[in-house]
Amino acid sequence: EKEKRFGGMRGFDIAKTLAGENMEGIYLNSTVWDILEGKRVAVKNLETDTVFFVDADYLVVATGAVPFMPAFENDDLPGVYTAAVVQKMMNNELTLLGKNILTVGAGNIGYLTSYQLMQAGAHVKAIIEGMPKEGGFPVQANRVRRLAIPIMTSHVLLKAIPNADHTGITGAVIAECENFKPIPGTERILNGIDVINICTGLIPDNQLLMKGKAVFGEHCYAAGDAVRIGEGTSAVLRGKQTAIEILMDLGARVSYDDYLVVSKEYIDSQQHPVRILETPCLPETERMHKRGFVQMDCLYGFACNPCSFACPHGAITKSSTSTVPHVDYDKCIGCVECVYQCPGLAIFGYDLRKDNLFLPIEYEVKEKEVVYLVNNYGERLGEGIVEKVLHKPNKTNIARVKALDVHGEDLVKVRGFVVKENYPESLDLEPLVKDQPGATFICHCDDVTLDDVLKVVGDRTFISIDEIKHTTRLGMGPCRGKRCIPRLKTALRAKGIEIVGDATPRAPLSNQLNLGELYPPKRGDEHRVANRSDFKKIEVGALIAGGGIAGSALFRYMADSGLNPVLVNADRGSSWRNIGGGRTAFSLPELAEIAEHNHAIF
C-alpha cells in the first residue's frame, strides 16, 4: 500500500470500512439461490424467510471460497471439521469444539486456525502436511512454531479413530507419504485428540459465477476468492479493478492510468513469498549495546507493508513487494512502537543493557509469570519473567520480558516465549497394530461412499460426472456438488480414474429455500437503489412502454378516456413517425391521421 489503509486490518474490519456508514443497497442475511433469465437475481432473506428478486444490468460475484476436504476413513464422525466450522464456532459462537486438536494442512489457514485455537485455550498436538515442505507465509509458520507446536511434513491423514459409540473421535491414523501417497509400514496412531481440524485448502465458490456468465454474459464479473484464492488486500484490489471495468463499460470517464496501477497492484498481491535474506539484519555490535533496537525477522518478499507506516521516526522502509523491510538503525531509537503493528508478529525489540525483550503477544499472560524463551522453532533457549504487558489498541500487545539466563548478543536469538506450564510434551505416536476398517464418505449430503462410486465405475478408467450423479445421487444434495465433486475427483485420480465433464449448477443453489416460498402469499414493496442520480419516481394512471403504432395509438385512446397515461420509449423510429409527425410522407392516410392526433395530444 502507498498509504496505510487495509494492511494489518482483519477481514471483517475491511468489510465494515468499505461498506461505510450508509448501508443503502446492502441487504444483509440474504442469500442468492438462483439467477433467472432476463438478468433477474433470486434472493432469500434468512431472517424474515422472504423471497425477493433483484433486476440488474451487471453482476459481480464475490461469494468467496469453500473448504476442500480430502476423503479419508470415518470422515463423517463428529469431531472431524473443516477450518471454516472451527473458526465460525470460535469467533461467532464463542465455542470450542474440542480441547486437543490435530490440524491437517501446513498452510496459512492451518497456521491461523491453530494459532486461534491456542488463543481460545485449546492444545494443538501437531500440524501435518502432505508436501515435503511447509506452505503459506513463513512468518505465519514461525508464529505457530514459536508455540512449540510440531509441524510434520510429508505426512497424510488416513483415518479418524472413533470412540466406543461413534459420537466423537479419540485419535487419528497418520502415515509418511510421497507424492501424497502413504508409504506402507509407516502408519502410526496419534491418540488423545478430540478434534481434527481440516485445513487442506480452499476452492472458489463459483457456481453463481458459472450461471451468471450464462445469463449476464460479458456483464458478469467476479472478485475475491470466487475468482482466485488470495489474501484480503488482493480481494480489495480486485474489487476496485472490477468497479473500474464496469464504469468503463458504462461509458463513464475514468482514469485509465489508475486502472493500470490497480491492475499491477492486484497482480503483485498474488505473488508467492520469495526469499531475499538468509538471516535477519542487525545493527553493528556497538549500536546494539548503545540503546534499544528492533529486529525484523521478515526474510521473504511479498505484498505486505504495514511496518513501513509503523515507525514514528521513519526508520522502516519497504520499496516494493519483492523486497523486505529495511531498518535504519541511525533513526531507530528502540521505542518498539513497530512491534505490535506487524500482522505476522515478525518484529522484536531488544535492550541488551537491561536484558529486556519486547515481544508481541496475542493471548493472556500474567505479569510476573516465569516463561521459557524460545526461538522460531519453539526450542527452549532459557528462562525469563514477564515484567509488564503493554496493551495496544489492535489487540496485539507487547510483553516486556526480563531474560534470566540469556544475556548479551545471545538475546537476539529469542523470538518468543511459552509459559512453563503450557510447554507441550514431546509427541508420542504409537505403531498401528490392528486396524478396523471404516467407511470413506465422498458425499456427506446423501451418504455416498467411495465404494458406492467404485462399484458404478467398475473396471473403467473414466466416467462422466452426469453418470455418477444419476446412479449414486452424489452432487445432488444441498451443497449441489461444490464440496463432494472435488473430493471425488481427487480420490478417483489416485486410483487412475478420471472424471469427464463438470457438473451444471442447478437451482436452488442455497439449501435454505423451501418450495412453498417460491409463491409468496403477498407481494412485497418494490425498492429501487439510487445508483443513478437522474431517475425519478412518479405515479401514473397508466404506463405504456413503447411508442410504435400500437403504443402511440393506445396512448391516444387512453388519453381521450381520461386515464392520464405516460408513455416511455427508448429511441426513435416508429415512434418519431407515429407520435411526433416527424415524417413528411406516410404510406397510409390512416397513419397520417394517427400522427396528427397524437401530436396534438402530446
Predicted regions and their residues:
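Short, solvent-exposed secondary-structure boundary/capping segments
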Residues: 391-403
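Glycine-rich FAD pyrophosphate-binding loop
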Residues: 1, 126-134, 559-576
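Iron-sulfur cluster-binding cysteine motifs and their immediate structural context
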Residues: 305-326, 337-353, 385, 447, ...
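Short beta-strand-centered aromatic/proline hotspots
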Residues: 379-391
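Residues forming the flavin
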Residues: 1-292, 336, 414-441, 448-472, ...
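Conserved FAD-binding subdomain of flavin-dependent enzymes
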Residues: 11-26, 557-560, 570-602
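N-terminal Rossmann-like FAD-binding beta1-loop-alpha1 element of flavoenzymes
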Residues: 113-118, 538-567
